[in-house]
Curated annotation (Swiss-Prot):
Keyword Chloroplast: no
Changes after translation: N- and O-glycosylated. Phosphorylated on Tyr-628 and Tyr-644 by SRC; these phosphorylations promote endothelial cell adhesion and migration.
Phosphotyrosine found at: 628, 644
PROSITE patterns associated with the record: ASX_HYDROXYL, C_TYPE_LECTIN_2, EGF_2, EGF_3, EGF_CA
Subunit text: Homodimer. Interacts with C1QBP; the association may represent a cell surface C1q receptor. Interacts with surfactant protein A/SFTPA1. Interacts with multimerin-2/MMRN2. Interacts with DAG1; this interaction plays an important role in endothelial cell migration. Interacts with CBL. Interacts with IGFBP7. Interacts with VEGFR2.
Name of the protein in question: Complement component C1q receptor
GO MF assignments: calcium ion binding; carbohydrate binding; complement component C1q complex binding; signaling receptor activity
Origin species: Homo sapiens
Effect of residue 220 to V: In a colorectal cancer sample; somatic mutation
Disulfide bonds: 141-165, 264-275, 271-285, 287-300, 306-317, 311-328, 330-343, 349-358, 354-367, 369-383, 389-400, 396-409, 411-425, 431-443, 439-452, 454-467
Organism superkingdom: Eukaryota
This protein's encoding gene: CD93
Compositionally skewed regions (Polar residues) per UniProt: 512-526, 640-652
Region described as Disordered: spans on this chain: 472-546, 553-572, 611-652
């Protein structure tokens, strides 16, 4: 007996040692089922709060069901009754729901991508305060939001609020504390006192209390009997132990602190149900019909072992033979865990029951098809290919080819695939291809094709690509050429050294650029669509006409000139003379234009100089002498005569 008492005292000393994380004190505790919840006040970050719970053997609290949310609300209500009035009207208390840095929001899940720090399976229960922000760049933590201006009612459970997790010294806005959770194998009933006394429980998570509804396994109880007189005080020490599977008690027999002075009048003698007094002041505990007295001689238990609901979660209690024992049974899709009291989900997808994709769900599973497949109908396979190229469904601009589980797009000749998803078609500009223009002279790009053309005085060869010198006439043709002229025109050839090879400019217009002539394309030149209608060169040489444009066609080979050798020589001489005559007319026209320009320029210079002289003359400054003029000079004798000659008829 002394050895047992020594071990109990040693256990009490170990349990009462102060733990790490003393930045917050346990203010309230609620134990129910197989878990205890503790509420703490203190402005700590989420990491500091988790460290405090963890060093005492627990984690920040989980809230996986409405029932568990009510337990957490009860312990917070106890804390608020003991705590002084908080300054903030809206207060927050950390719980164990967090999302790590780099993990993004998932709106399709009840927990939105968050997870419980204590582990375990996610449940569909959630109680978010508002829509969450999609942020992946920092760690986010969840707290319970309490409106202290309103009473805590079971119908108004605390909302979940997510935000930054805080740091030491800066826990976050309105953070007032946190809630811890500690899980146990089972619970003992509170010790019953049959007389005056006090019981103090010390839990494994270093909480002391005298008013626990259930006492967790491995807790110690210190019972002090008496009414306060030290001479009459007696102490008893007990430990909550597991007597049998899922059976926990203190190992005591009968009520504690019993006194003949009170009998059954004090706390019903400490009996669970009935108390029967003897004639000498003693009493005994009894049970009602359908119940039996347990070994502690105080507690009553139903004769039906399932009446105490030993099975947890979704497990159902099933009586054994003669009703003396029981087993727990799980619904379909679940199986018993290692304790044989609770149920866990069966992962049916491990057996690969689906043709393609299997998604495990609580209590079951569902089959899904890969992208590009859809569920088949009756009599068809589980998943069948989706024909993306079907009428009205094709995503391609032109050609669409369906494949098993996918598709690919194609374009007609003259187009290439374009767009981010490769479903659009873009025209190929053959006139600016990497190999240079396909035409010898002018090139015109069209949607899906191109056309070739020639400068005035040149005609498109039968291959639709090269240009040959056209016939030259001194005057406009009087009528359509006869068959012989046509033959000569088609058969004439002109050797080319360095000619102007026009190509398409950046605006899509033909642009002539000097290039070295090259031989005409062979008979395997590309064949293009219908030619663009344009006027053939006609009229006097040296005058610009609309280029002769034809579409490139396949030529059967080099054409033989009609007639014999003499015909070929004649045609060559005619072509040379025509070319010289054309050059003569061009040079003459250029010289005439230059002479006219020189004459106009000389006339313009002359008129400008004359205008300047007149303007200078008009602006010449005047002086005083300009107002006088010289008198005509007379002979001196004539003047003397006029002055001294006597007047006629006088002596003077």
């Amino acid at each position: 007996m002394a050895t047992s008492m020594g071990l109990l005292l040693l256990l009490l000393l170990l349990l009462t040692q102060p733990g790490a994380g003393t930045g917050a004190d346990t203010e309230a505790v609620v134990c129910v089922g197989t878990a205890c919840y503790t509420a703490h006040s203190g402005k700590l970050s989420a990491a500091e709060a988790q460290n405090h719970c963890n060093q005492n053997g627990g984690n920040l609290a989980t809230v996986k069901s409405k029932e568990e949310a009510q337990h957490v609300q009860r312990v917070l209500a106890q804390l608020l009754r003991r705590e002084a009035a908080l300054t903030a009207r809206m207060s927050k208390f950390w719980i164990g729901l967090q999302r790590e840095k780099g993990k993004c929001l998932d709106p399709s899940l009840p927990l939105k991508g968050f997870s419980w720090v204590g582990g375990g399976e996610d449940t569909p229960y959630s109680n978010w305060h508002k829509e969450l922000r999609n942020s992946c760049i920092s760690k986010r933590c969840v707290s319970l939001l309490l409106d202290l201006s309103q009473p805590l009612l079971p119908s108004r459970l605390p909302k979940w609020s997510e935000g930054p997790c805080g740091s030491p010294g800066s826990p976050g806005s309105n953070i007032e504390g946190f809630v811890c959770k500690f899980s146990f194998k089972g619970m003992c009933r509170p010790l019953a006192l049959g007389g005056p006394g006090q019981v103090t429980y010390t839990t494994p998570f270093q909480t002391t209390s005298s008013s626990l509804e259930a006492v967790p396994f491995a807790s110690a109880a210190n019972v002090a009997c008496g009414e306060g007189d030290k001479d009459e005080t007696q102490s008893h020490y007990f430990l909550c132990k597991e007597k049998a599977p899922d059976v926990f008690d203190w190992g005591s027999s009968g009520p504690l602190c019993v006194s003949p002075k009170y009998g059954c009048n004090f706390n019903n003698g400490g009996c669970h149900q009935d108390c029967f007094e003897g004639g000498d002041g003693s009493f005994l505990c009894g049970c009602r019909p359908g119940f039996r007295l347990l070994d502690d001689l105080v507690t009553c238990a139903s004769r039906n072992p399932c009446s105490s609901s030993p099975c947890r979660g979704g497990a159902t209690c099933v009586l054994g033979p003669h009703g003396k024992n029981y087993t727990c049974r799980c619904p379909q899709g679940y199986q018993l865990d290692s304790s044989q009291l609770d149920c866990v989900d069966v992962d049916e997808c491990q057996d690969s029951p689906c043709a393609q994709e299997c998604v495990n769900t609580p209590g079951g599973f569902r089959c899904e098809c890969w992208v590009g497949y859809e569920p088949g109908g009756p009599g068809e396979g589980a998943c069948q290919d989706v024909d993306e190229c079907a009428l009205g469904r094709s995503p391609c601009a032109q050609g669409c080819t369906n494949t098993d589980g996918s598709f690919h797009c194609s374009c007609e000749e003259g187009y290439v695939l374009a767009g981010e998803d490769g479903t659009q078609c873009q025209d190929v500009d053959e006139c600016v291809g990497p190999g240079g223009p396909l035409c010898d002279s002018l090139c015109f790009n069209t949607q899906g094709s191109f056309h070739c053309g020639c400068l005035p005085g040149w005609v498109l060869a039968p291959n639709g690509v090269s240009c040959t010198m056209g016939p030259v006439s001194l005057g406009p043709p009087s009528g359509p050429p006869d068959e012989e002229d046509k033959g000569e025109k088609e058969g004439s050839t002109v050797p080319r050294a360095a000619t102007a090879s026009p190509t398409r400019g950046p605006e899509g217009t033909p642009k002539a650029t000097p290039t070295t002539s090259r031989p005409s394309l062979s008979s395997d030149a590309p064949i293009t669509s219908a030619p663009l209608k344009m006027l053939a060169p006609s009229g006097s040489p040296g005058v610009w006409r609309e280029p002769s444009i034809h579409h490139a066609t396949a030529a059967s080979g080099p054409q033989e000139p009609a007639g014999g050798d003499s015909s070929v020589a004649t045609q060559n001489n005619d072509g040379t003379d025509g070319q010289k005559l054309l050059l003569f007319y061009i040079l003459g026209t250029v010289v005439a234009i230059l002479l006219l320009l020189a004459l106009a320029l000389g006339l313009l210079v002359y008129r400008k100089r004359r205008a300047k002289r007149e303007e200078k003359k008009e602006k010449k400054p005047q002086n005083a002498a300009d107002s006088y003029s010289w008198v005509p000079e007379r002979a001196e004798s004539r003047a003397m005569e006029n002055q001294y000659s006597p007047t006629p008829g006088t002596d003077c």
